[in-house]
């Protein structure tokens, strides 16, 4: 018998899970998402990606500012859900919310717990040079991503993979895992494993202040920094263009041959020296412009070495 579910999520990452649960035949009685925000040139209020998908599916959407009032808890409990599915909702669930569904609340988290608990696991896994990443279905408790784990999906990481690439790979994988978890829950077969006490790390929210590239670091670290922050907020540097230092986001790069003073342009194909080795820019973006492949950028803005990149 299909489950009565409450779905709680906000960004694009959560949409495949909502869509797949609905396609699996579960009765999604309500969707909780964050409030609409001004967006675009006209700064019109734009519902979240999850709210838009819920409206397309004909599911009621709730966007409370808080879940910590008795009224919010009563409204949540009134749905008499078997379970709540939480994917990047963006709000901490208080104990009355966690306790309301018959079988509890289940979170899809984008890391291999207990590594990278917290807000930015995808970015931090790439920035740290982890060999693999993944998603886990866990039963939520009051702690920060400390619940018992039910199912795990893994993806090998490569030097070429950006945070955007990993996001797009984990979202559908996570959707499949959550559908399987709900199927096992429905059959009374879902089992859990406690997280190890060793290996706990925290994925702090990305701060724009950490986005500037430090060319004194080894090339591999610079590459991971760039790819871990791509596309948002975007690792940046200043290129000397027509006598001015112009801020440019670097979205994709590769390791390159060569060496020199860190931050020196080594050739006419955007190879830049790092503290050890070099990287070559493959994709970049100027402020207010669309992302460009490096070869297209160089057609309009040829740069000749040696130049100092800040």
Swiss-Prot record:
Q: Name one GO cellular component term.
A: cytosol
InterPro entries, per database record: Fmt, Formyl_trans_C, Formyl_trans_C_sf, Formyl_transf_N, Formyl_transf_N_sf, Formyl_transferase-like_C_sf, GART_AS, Met-tRNA-FMT_C
Q: Which UniProt keywords apply?
A: Protein biosynthesis, Transferase
Q: Which annotated residues bind (6S)-5,6,7,8-tetrahydrofolate?
A: 111-114
UniProt cross-references to SUPFAM superfamilies, sorted A to Z: FMT C-terminal domain-like, Formyltransferase
Entry EC number(s): 2.1.2.9
Q: Which CDD domains match?
A: FMT_core_Met-tRNA-FMT_N, Met_tRNA_FMT_C
NCBIfam families assigned: fmt
Q: What does this protein do?
A: Attaches a formyl group to the free amino group of methionyl-tRNA(fMet). The formyl group appears to play a dual role in the initiator identity of N-formylmethionyl-tRNA by promoting its recognition by IF2 and preventing the misappropriation of this tRNA by the elongation apparatus.
Stated family:
Belongs to the Fmt family.
What is the protein named? Methionyl-tRNA formyltransferase
From the UniProt record, report the name of the gene that encodes this protein: fmt
């Amino acid at each position: 018998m299909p489950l009565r579910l409450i779905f709680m999520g906000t960004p694009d990452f959560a949409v495949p899970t909502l869509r797949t649960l609905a396609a699996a035949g579960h009765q999604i009685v309500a969707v909780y998402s964050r409030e609409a925000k001004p967006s675009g040139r006209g700064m019109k209020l734009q519902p979240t990606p999850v709210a838009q998908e819920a409206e397309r599916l004909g599911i009621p959407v709730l966007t409370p500012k808080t879940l910590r009032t008795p009224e919010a808890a009563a409204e949540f409990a009134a749905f008499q859900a078997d379970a709540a599915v939480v994917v990047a909702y963006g709000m901490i669930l208080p104990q009355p919310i966690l306790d309301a569904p018959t079988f509890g609340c289940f979170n899809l988290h984008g890391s291999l717990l207990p590594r990278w608990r917290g807000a930015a696991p995808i970015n931090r896994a790439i920035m740290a040079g982890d060999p693999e990443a993944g998603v886990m279905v866990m039963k939520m408790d009051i702690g920060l991503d400390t619940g018992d784990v039910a199912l795990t999906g893994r993806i090998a990481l490569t030097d070429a993979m950006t945070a955007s690439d990993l996001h797009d790979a984990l979202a559908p994988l996570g959707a499949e895992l959550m559908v399987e978890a709900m199927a096992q829950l429905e059959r009374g077969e879902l089992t859990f494993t406690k997280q190890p006490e060793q290996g706990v790390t925290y994925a702090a929210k990305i701060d724009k202040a950490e986005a500037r590239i430090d060319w004194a670091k080894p090339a591999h670290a610079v590459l991971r920094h760039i790819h871990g922050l791509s596309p948002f907020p975007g690792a940046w540097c200043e290129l000397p263009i027509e006598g001015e230092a112009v801020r440019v986001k670097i979205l994709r790069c590769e390791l390159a041959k060569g060496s020199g003073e860190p931050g020196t342009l080594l050739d006419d194909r955007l190879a830049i020296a790092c503290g050890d080795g070099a990287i070559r820019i493959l994709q970049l973006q100027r402020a207010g412009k669309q992302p460009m492949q490096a070869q297209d950028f160089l057609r309009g803005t040829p740069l000749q070495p040696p130049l100092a990149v800040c």
